[in-house]
């Protein structure tokens, strides 16, 4: 079985990898070892912990040991939204243009910086919580509040797709969820909803995620 090491941004992504991604990839012959969480900070409000990335050197410093682990493959689950300003190629990626093309270019730059043949970089477009917009009805049912689905559908329609919901400080996916659900808890509600929505629905609505998942699934058929 092919081994895969993961560097993830925070606790929400860690839970998603453990509970949703790992069992899915196991069906394809890929064993995901417990992910490494890049950084977490306990909130003063008592609302759990928040992931985040402070600078490029922090990312590189945490990735390099993974690239030295024998025949294992390495991947990441980091948000495009909120990347540190010194991330290689980020200034150009924040300019005008198709977000999907920009994030792919940024991932290519990421791969070049690490220069490791078994590294598969992935940056969630625009952030992890965008995947929840794949199934607005499931989000509404989870919180038991009317009209949430309508508002999420409206956001998706306006952007064009869940992954295209933008970088605005008040309009990025997590901000919109918090505006709709004041007590949204990213480390519990987010991963729970991901399980309810399921991989199939997320990949159908999020082509950038689907590209990454296809690549990871294919590892099961490659020689170690």
Predicted regions located by residue number:
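Catalytic nucleophile-elbow at a beta strand-turn-alpha helix junction centered on a G-D-S/GDSL motif
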Residues: 6-15
């Amino acid at each position: 079985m092919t081994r895969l090491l993961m560097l993830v941004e925070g606790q929400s992504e860690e839970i998603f990898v453990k509970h949703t991604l790992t069992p899915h990839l196991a069906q394809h012959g890929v064993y995901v070892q417990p992910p490494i969480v890049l950084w977490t900070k306990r909130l003063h409000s008592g609302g759990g912990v928040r992931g985040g990335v402070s600078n490029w050197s922090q990312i590189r410093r945490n990735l390099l040991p993974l690239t030295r682990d024998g025949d294992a493959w390495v991947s990441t689950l980091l948000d495009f939204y909120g990347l540190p300003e010194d991330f290689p190629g980020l200034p150009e990626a924040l300019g005008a243009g198709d977000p999907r093309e920009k994030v792919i270019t940024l991932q290519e730059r990421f791969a070049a910086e690490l220069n490791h043949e078994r590294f598969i970089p992935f940056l969630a477009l625009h952030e992890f919580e965008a995947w929840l917009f794949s199934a607005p009805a499931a989000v509404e049912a989870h919180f038991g509040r009317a009209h949430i689905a309508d508002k999420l559908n409206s956001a998706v329609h306006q952007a064009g797709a869940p992954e295209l919901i933008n970088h605005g400080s008040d309009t990025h996916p997590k901000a919109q969820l918090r505006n709709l659900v004041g007590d949204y808890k990213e480390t519990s509600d987010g991963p729970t909803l991901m399980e309810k929505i399921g991989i199939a629905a997320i990949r159908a609505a999020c082509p950038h995620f689907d590209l990454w998942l296809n690549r990871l699934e294919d590892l099961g058929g490659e020689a170690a």
